Amino acid sequence: YNPVVMSYLLVTQDNVLWFVRKGAVPEEDTETEDSFHELTADGVSLQEYSDVGLALSNLVDGSYIKALFVDPSTLNYDLYSILNENASQFVVMGASPVALRKSVKNEVEVAGMREAHLEDGVAVERFLHWLETSLQAGDAINEYEASVKLHEFRSGIEGFRGESFETISAYGPNAALPHYVTPEEGSAELYTEGLYLCDSGGQYLFGTTDITRTVPLGPCSQLEKEDYTLVLKGHI
């Protein structure tokens, strides 16, 4: 669900080395292969992901190193140990300037975020309308089938690239389970009573969403009404 590849980037005065699992890309994924070729043509050296420790050791062994900037919040213990043992006098710790700049959204990014939430919100509303009318008509629907239908509504949006995480489609007691995994086989049937929770999101070329809605599918118990109201008041 994460469209950003897990990797390391080492930038020196003369080179840019990208440590990535290039071999994990399926042969039929020509779009990614084309991206690799473009990066190579631009001077980025593609390296094996597992070689980052060795490259870092070789780098700090060089006498020409005067400073090495790292972000401790994204550095694992193994790489930190290499630096701490061999180059502690050169290491400068601080927040990544890349992350800091990305945290401030430009006008295009802000517009994309708004468009994503508007488009995605329409898809979710269409889904909830379908769910309500289908159940009232007597159609049999379970948790997993509901999540599949939501995917169909989202996939009709131009620029849709898939879910931003696995959809949590949970009915009744299942909705009380943190990070409930909706089973493809044997998921709970939905009825015209009680509460239904749907936690989902979409990846679009212009933005990413994460939306949770808990809705009554029909009459609710007094306890469900009280709990629902208290949670709503807490959010407001």
Give the location of each predicted region.
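Active-site neighborhoods and metal-handling regions in enzymes and metal-associated proteins
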Residues: 1-236
